[in-house]
Design a protein with these regions (language model features):
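N-terminal [4Fe-4S]-dependent radical SAM core
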Residues: 1-39, 45-55, 67-77
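Short hydrophobic-acidic sequence motifs that mark active-site Asp/Glu residues
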Residues: 21-23, 81, 141, 179
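Short strand-loop junctions, especially beta-strand C-caps/beta-turns
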Residues: 25-27, 85-87, 183-185, 222
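Amphipathic alpha-helical segments in well-structured domains
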Residues: 58, 100, 202, 235, ...
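Conserved AdoMet/S-adenosylmethionine-binding subsite of the radical SAM
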Residues: 92-232
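Binuclear metal-ion centers of metallo-dependent hydrolases, dominated by the metallo-beta-lactamase
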Residues: 235-257
Length: 257
């Protein structure tokens, strides 16, 4: 069963990577809006979840977030992180930069020790206002599943223009103020082998990671049901092997099995 998240606030949930996380979903509550259509997405395929509701407004997000933070301040739990995630790509929201400003102000008011994180597929980092907003937050988590141009079109299935070289250059512009997040998996999709744990995929990806020089790398594998049922988790051993190669570059890495 794939997951469509409430909007604009959900949780808190316990994140494998981030701790007690209050979710901020800038997409409609009844469907998906994303510039990727990943075959492993827990929210399902884009075509199966076309939203009829509008995007939440900046004002709706701010009001709902403040109400939830006030309640958590009174009744708990204390969040470790406020995470922009949900049903698609958060930076696709036209008021994303302003919503980040609101969120940072509310965080400082209610839970100044909490981090603000954004999980992004990196497709809008070339937009100056999006870039500036991401540069202000604590955890600018950017997806780079592969540097193979053919593989990315089967795994992540970008819905518009997508150039891996442009994405890498955009990530480099953060000058280390980013975290690279990469999905490793196995199995097949429509008869095509999808294993990206081999040297064929890992070594070029690792070169790109070194070029980007992020402050951290997060590698993970499938945790929830995927829309395609022929995909499989990467093994603990495979993830540990990839993690060790990252550590050898001097870049910190976290692994979610």
């Amino acid at each position: 069963m794939t997951v469509i998240y409430p909007s604009p606030i959900f949780g808190p949930v316990h994140s494998r990577r981030l701790g007690v996380s209050l979710g901020i979903n800038l997409l409609p509550a009844d469907g998906k809006v994303c510039t990727f259509d990943c075959i492993y997405c827990e929210c399902g395929f884009n075509a199966d979840h076309r939203p009829k509701q509008p995007l939440p407004t900046r004002e709706e997000v701010r009001s709902a977030l403040e109400a939830r933070l006030w309640d958590m301040q009174q009744n708990g739990p204390t969040p470790d992180v406020l995470t922009f995630a949900g049903n698609g790509e958060p930076t696709a929201h036209p008021r994303f930069p302003e919503i980040i400003e609101d969120t940072l102000a509310l965080r400082d008011k209610y839970f100044p020790n909490a981090k603000v994180s954004v999980l992004s597929n990196s497709t809008f980092i070339h937009r100056p206002a999006v870039f500036e907003a991401l540069n202000k937050i604590d955890n600018n988590i950017l997806k780079l599943d592969t540097v193979d141009e053919e593989y990315v079109r089967v795994l992540d299935r970008p819905t518009g223009h997508y150039s891996i070289r442009e994405i890498i250059e955009g990530m480099k512009a953060f000058k280390g103020n980013c975290i690279i997040q990469t999905m490793f998996l196995k199995g097949s999709y429509k008869g095509q082998d999808m294993d990206n744990t081999s040297d064929k995929f890992v070594l070029p990806w690792l070169e790109a990671v070194k070029e980007i020089a992020p402050r951290q790398v997060m590698i993970y594998t499938i945790d929830r049901e995927t829309p395609d049922h022929d995909l499989q988790k990467a093994t603990r051993e495979e993830l540990d092997c990839i993690a060790e190669r990252i550590r050898e570059t001097g870049i910190p890495v976290s692994v979610s099995y």
